[in-house]
Amino acid sequence: MRALSNLFYQRRTLTLLLILTPPLLWFGVVYVGSLLTLLSQSVLTFDDMSMSVVAELTTANFAGLLVPANLDIVLRTLGMAIAVTLGTVLIGFPMAYYMAHHASPTEKGFFFVGVMLPMWASYIVKAYAWTVLLAQGGVIYWALDALGWRGALQAVLQLPVIGGDTLATSNLGRFLVFTYIWLPFMVLPIQAAIERVPANLLLASGDLGGRPLQTFRHVLWPLAFPGVVAGSIFTFSLTLGDYIIPQLVGPSGLYIGNMVYTMQGTIGNIPMAAAFTCVPIVLITIYLAMARRLGAFNAL
């Protein structure tokens, strides 16, 4: 036993290899293997007559993604992912800044609990709870009626992009649910990035005559930007792949996740479902490459 211990001590590379081999094998089999299986299925043929997969190679599935109806699904999903990411930044950055530079230890603890609280409940429970909040007769409509703002809401809901008779059937309602659920994934990376910004830099900017907006633009934002990008990795990718919220909240119109579920679970067109699944993979890969160049991984 001592001889074996001495061997591992003297040969650190061998020790490291033995430690890393099991997780790397698991990663290779489960993750890389599943991706290769996905790619292999995306080039197979689906026979509409027999409703079965035929082992004939084709690129028709990827060409089918460019059909206007399918392209609309991709653009709809991408637009919501971008909107949710921007929304979480606008809400999360002030919260993260206060937590990092102004909150007392007790206040910071309360903020952390408040930010993390949505993650303690089941995802399905949160989504269903929002359908109740957004429905006619829900708390939000009750508050708007009390303030006399219901007419203003109805005017907003008539806008083409917002669309919907009520909040529960509008893109605005869907956006609110996405933003609420993914907000913790944006706040925490930004807060970690801002905490690394020395307070002396902000004070020095003010001493040199910099106005608050100038200090934010030229000092705080560039230094906190990697944290913003790190948080956006989560919000962007999670929105791209989600299919529960689009089913529960918002107007009719499929997202990528819904289309994959329909193609595979209802129709049985696995090759087309695999081709649709490749879309968020490609988008997220491009986004991760951009995030890495911006130094976002240092803020994770």
Predicted regions and their residues:
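Short membrane-interfacial helix/loop motifs at transmembrane-helix boundaries
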Residues: 31-70, 137, 250-251, 263, ...
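N-terminal signal-anchor/first transmembrane alpha helix
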Residues: 1-40, 108-114
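Transmembrane alpha-helix signature in integral membrane proteins
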Residues: 68-101
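Cytoplasmic-entry segments and transmembrane alpha-helices of multi-pass inner-membrane transporters
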Residues: 16-20, 95-133, 202-203, 225-226
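Membrane-interfacial helix termini and adjacent extracytoplasmic/periplasmic loops
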Residues: 5, 9, 127-179, 213, ...
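Interhelical loop and adjacent transmembrane-helix boundary motif
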Residues: 10-15, 49, 62-69, 246-292
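Transmembrane alpha-helices
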Residues: 22-31, 86, 117, 180, ...
